[in-house]
């Protein structure tokens, strides 16, 4: 795997609440320099990032109902529509974790379908926050996401007590098969960690340490 191939698996991420426009500018400049697949940012910063990234191949990914996922379906749909108008090209939505634990299958499938519809063909990733789930619940969530028509199952927000693990990525991939991609995120800071996730089945890596990961290739 060369630097470009690795960079194309990375969503270069900055989702902390205490950031400035200068931080977003740095993020976008790094994405252009290193060739990251996307920048993943909060919706407020989409217009600024769109201007910085015009005439590049770097996509703009944003988060929906982040980081808790406990809003209503209509609220999530509204966020997607507004973010789409601003220029978002991919959407990372947090699943309703309480509804998942309560086995509200029909509700969750309907919600995912509504969000996918609102995204108008753009990529939708559903974050399940694996650190709060049993293995049975992780499998259940992945099956629901497949049925709902989303494009990725994503491990974590990065705001929970634990992020992605190799074991979780391997489990999610075993259920996702070829119908659903897997995004690993949360706590991935080194090239070695990223490679472990990719080898376990991750199609995309969400990280705020993209530059360090790329620079670690070949060391």
Swiss-Prot record:
Residues of the active site: 92 (proton donor/acceptor), 154 (schiff-base intermediate with acetaldehyde), 183 (proton donor/acceptor)
GO cellular component, one term: cytoplasm
Localization annotation: Cytoplasm
Catalyzed reactions per annotation: 2-deoxy-D-ribose 5-phosphate = D-glyceraldehyde 3-phosphate + acetaldehyde
GO molecular function, one term: deoxyribose-phosphate aldolase activity
Biological-process GO terms, alphabetical: 2-deoxyribose 1-phosphate catabolic process; carbohydrate catabolic process; deoxyribonucleotide catabolic process
Annotated metabolic or biological route of this protein: Carbohydrate degradation; 2-deoxy-D-ribose 1-phosphate degradation; D-glyceraldehyde 3-phosphate and acetaldehyde from 2-deoxy-alpha-D-ribose 1-phosphate: step 2/2
Name of the top EC class for this enzyme: lyase
Record-listed E.C. numbers: 4.1.2.4
InterPro entries: Aldolase_TIM, DeoC, DeoC/FbaB/LacD_aldolase, DeoC_typeI
Signal peptide interval: none
Chief location bin: cytoplasm
Keyword entries, A-Z: Cytoplasm, Lyase, Schiff base
Family: Belongs to the DeoC/FbaB aldolase family. DeoC type 1 subfamily.
Functional summary from the UniProt entry: Catalyzes a reversible aldol reaction between acetaldehyde and D-glyceraldehyde 3-phosphate to generate 2-deoxy-D-ribose 5-phosphate.
UniProt protein name: Deoxyribose-phosphate aldolase
Organism: Dictyoglomus turgidum (strain DSM 6724 / Z-1310)
